[in-house]
Amino acid sequence: MRLTKQYANALLKSTSKEEAVAVYKELINVTDLFEQFPEYIGLIEFQTEEFETVRSIFAEKVENIVLNFLEVLAEDRLLSQLDTVIEDYRLVLVENNLLFEVKVYSSKPLSEGNQAQLVQIIESQWGSDYLIDYRVDPKTLGGIKLEVNGAVIDTTFRSRIDQIIREVQHGAKR
């Protein structure tokens, strides 16, 4: 297991299941801030005493667990790997079904109304902790295909046509 995933697992173990996704979202916000001020990463990573400055800046905006985790990364000189750690943390959340990755494939872009309906279905089935990615795939021929944490729900016409072909071929072999 790579080092960044070990840190991601340690972070998950130090949070409650209820807080785990909120911590992920806060880490994303922190990286957005670091992207605006990239010089801070190098400064913090090589002068860890400067972390108190970061702590005072983020104190009102970021949970202590996130600040503590960032400080550990800084002390271990891994802050420059923050994006990889966050990606590994996302994967750990998905593996533990605390965060749901939903990929929606359709033959054409879904209308806002269809997207809203789909979001309602997703939230009723899996809750509010999800990431959704809409993709256009002309091969679907209509309908939609959902992938949720690797599981596939395929209601596309292409899937139905393939099923009919298999049934006809199976029937012809009898």
What spans do the regions from the language model cover?
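Elongated, mostly alpha-helical coiled-coil "stalk/stator" tethers of large membrane protein machines
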Residues: 1-174
